Amino acid sequence: MTAEQLPPELQRVHMVGIGGAGMAGIARILLDRGGLVSGSDAKESRGVHALRARGALIRIGHDASALDLLPGGVTSVITTHAAIPKTNPELVEARRRGVPVMLRPVVLAKLMDGRITVMVTGTHGKTTTTSMAIVALQHCGRDPSFAVGGELGEAGTNAHHGSGDYFVAEADESDGSLLEYTPHVAVVTNIEADHLDFYGSTEAYVGVFDAFVERLAPGGALVVCADDPGSAALAERSAELGIRVLRYGSAGHAGAALAATLVSWEQRGTGAVAQIQLAGEADPRSMRLSVPGRHMALNVLGALLAAIEVGAPVGEVLDGLAGFEGVRRRFELVGTAESVRVFDDYAHHPTEVRATLEAVRSVVRQSGSGRLLVVFQPHLYSRTKAFAAEFGSALDAADEVFVLDVYAAREQPLTGISGASVAEHVTVPVRYLRDFSAVAEVVAAAAGPGDVVVTMGAGDVTLLGPEIVAALRMRADRSEPGRPGVLQ
């Protein structure tokens, strides 16, 4: 595509905070469609380097003059209000010049215009389920455009401008921005109280999902997980409004009929096999997965129904999903050393922690020996305050837990809230580690052959996985006198 096929306001843009995952994804699509992109960010990153290689002009640091990086100026400035304050000098300068300032969700909605859109939302599992739907359509030769919150393993990116008629995207519910979209198919994985710092009440948080579903395009469909009470209730309310609802879930539901049923599921190593029943078919189908966890099998059903709804053949979809390799930071294998496997996971809500550790426990159990060690970093003071006890209970699925201090992100500290707030609710052996720089050595010293270590959280805990692997290898070097390259 050429710049003429972009809306005029998106042909020459400046992006404030361009290095963030969501913003970088938008930048990739704009560049691929022939747009001119400049941007700024607080620091260098892999995402910044990749965008420069694609032609974006990026400055580190924020200054009003950054709006002049593109010769001839810009037609709009794009930002994300969650991370960028209104006092940012580039935003102040844009307003002074009369340059329109648009939020990322508004831009994404413009990029989806004219496409058949599949959007996935929910408290948990939306990145993985979105990625599954993308892989399913890719395997069927549809080449969808997509924008997702995590890096898709198969594609090595979180955004793509495709040649097909489809656009698959994750709809973030954290700040109400999902109300910018009008999808043809909406998948809701689950609904459970979260982001109360923004919404103020559970009722307000739940209400945004109802408002989102009411924005479905005419003739659109809602796909929901009937196993989750929150999304099941949404399905009932939506059906009463005349919205077409497709439910998926486990066998044995006494409520409304399921469009896709998980009849059986069996963990096999880091994958699984399952039997599923589709409505209208006489016999169940076999389904293979390359990712662990029963919750992943349910996510597959959501992606499957979404793909079928836009015309993808069932058999081809299942073949594609069998090869789904996962999403970066979703139970991602970081490395192995000294017979210790180290994984990294993005889980940052008690329900996510519980589901992930249940899956990991199955992996540990099948290996025959070894323990499960979890390095957990609470994310946001408000979330830690609200769910400290629930986090402690979820972490009890591990054999040993290392709790770090809270990753503040956009928040200011709250008096009396720290990693200790979570650690005090853990009943298995637990250590509260305040010194981030010492964590890798402490965990490596605690791990033994056959153990599985999981670093967990939405913050910079992800940096520790490689450090733990390196510490384990250093331990191996020290234990082998005379090994080449090892100082004696």
Swiss-Prot record:
EC class name: ligase
UniProt cross-references to Pfam families, sorted A to Z: Mur_ligase (PF01225), Mur_ligase_C (PF02875), Mur_ligase_M (PF08245)
InterPro entries hit by this protein: Mur-like_cat_sf (IPR036565), Mur_ligase_C (IPR004101), Mur_ligase_C_dom_sf (IPR036615), Mur_ligase_cen (IPR013221), Mur_ligase_N (IPR000713), MurCDEF_pg_biosynth (IPR050061), UDP-N-AcMur_Ala_ligase_MurC (IPR005758)
SUPFAM superfamilies: MurCD N-terminal domain, MurD-like peptide ligases, catalytic domain, MurD-like peptide ligases, peptide-binding domain
UniProt keyword RNA-binding present: no
MF term (GO), any: UDP-N-acetylmuramate-L-alanine ligase activity
Keywords: ATP-binding, Cell cycle, Cell division, Cell shape, Cell wall biogenesis/degradation, Cytoplasm, Ligase, Nucleotide-binding, Peptidoglycan synthesis
Annotated pathway: Cell wall biogenesis; peptidoglycan biosynthesis
A GO CC term assigned to this protein in UniProt: cytoplasm
Biological processes per GO annotation: cell division; cell wall organization; peptidoglycan biosynthetic process; regulation of cell shape
Protein name: UDP-N-acetylmuramate--L-alanine ligase
Gene that specifies this protein: murC
HAMAP family attached to this UniProt entry: MurC
This enzyme's EC code(s): 6.3.2.8
Catalytic activity: UDP-N-acetyl-alpha-D-muramate + L-alanine + ATP = UDP-N-acetyl-alpha-D-muramoyl-L-alanine + ADP + phosphate + H(+)
tRNA processing in keyword set: no
